[in-house]
Structures are given as C-alpha cells and as structure tokens.
C-alpha cells in the first residue's frame, strides 16, 4: 500500500485529532461523527482504528509500520513503548516536534528537498533514525531559512518535549535523549497496535 494522499479531514473525523497529519480541527458538533448512530465497536475495529491512527499520524505505509513492529519486538522492553520511541525518533517527526514544520508531511517535504542537515551532513531520508546528541540544522541558503522561519513563527508555541531543545535564531535543534513515553504527542493505546 502506498502512502495516503487523500482527503485528510475525513481521516480526522473518523479517527479523532491527528496533529501530525494536519493542523485543522473539527468543529464542535457539525463535523463530529453522528452521536445518534452509536454502534458497538468490535474488538477488531478498535485495534484497527488504533493502528490507523498511528499510521496516518506518522505518515507510514503498512509495510513500514510492520517493519517497525518487528524491530520493536526484537528490542528489550515493552514492544509498544519501543515502537513509539522508534517512530518519535524519525527525522520528519523530530522536525515537526521542534516546530520547524507545521505537519509531518511538511517536514517530509523539507527533508526530501534537502533543506535539512544532521550533524553537518545533508540528509534527504525522512525516516532517518536520529540518535541522542544529534544536531539538526538548516542549510545556509536564504530559501531554506525562510521556510523554517515561517514555520517557527506560525507554529503554536506548545511546550517543547524534554528530549529536544531548539535555538530558533540559529535554526538549530538538538536531541538530548531518547523520548520519554509521557511526552508522546498522540493519545494512543500502543498495545492494541502491537496486538493487531
């Protein structure tokens, strides 16, 4: 299956808020699901919706998600926690969490168009796995800095996770450590994703 490129708002209405997919929010009442049509959800549907939330939030294909689940299963610790840590340490997600891009697809585009340097080297792979002590900067070109500047200026100033620090004047971000589970920006039950 290829990456989802269809209407994003339909997915948000179905699955709830996905901050990585788009910055739009459903209006209270009219855009929400019809409350009169409350059908009991099967266990399969609950697990599928949790998996789809994860997929659409991080912009993954089915195969990429399966590969991350296999890697997380082989690692020490809780498979669900390790899975979320792997996804949070992707370069496109780090850019989104730093505020250098308004959405994860926007961060993917910045990386693909070679605007981002990791430790002084151009990285054009959005799924690049960042490590603690990595320094993420923009190219010295004016166009690259202008793109990042508009994103930083327009992004809502949410609390930055404790595993990241940003210097918005030098357009530089630093990864301090691997993310703690309480700082993950998506409300999800990762055990249901692993069980699926």
Curated annotation (Swiss-Prot):
GO CC terms, sorted: chloroplast; small ribosomal subunit
Assigned protein family: Belongs to the universal ribosomal protein uS4 family.
Write the protein's name: Small ribosomal subunit protein uS4c
The record's note on quaternary structure and interaction partners says:
Part of the 30S ribosomal subunit. Contacts protein S5. The interaction surface between S4 and S5 is involved in control of translational fidelity.
Question: Which keywords label this protein?
Answer: Chloroplast, Plastid, Ribonucleoprotein, Ribosomal protein, RNA-binding, rRNA-binding
Please describe what this protein does.
One of the primary rRNA binding proteins, it binds directly to 16S rRNA where it nucleates assembly of the body of the 30S subunit. With S5 and S12 plays an important role in translational accuracy.
Any Pfam family matching the protein:
Ribosomal_S4
Which one GO biological process term can you cite for this protein?
Answer: ribosomal small subunit biogenesis
Q: Name one GO molecular function term.
A: rRNA binding
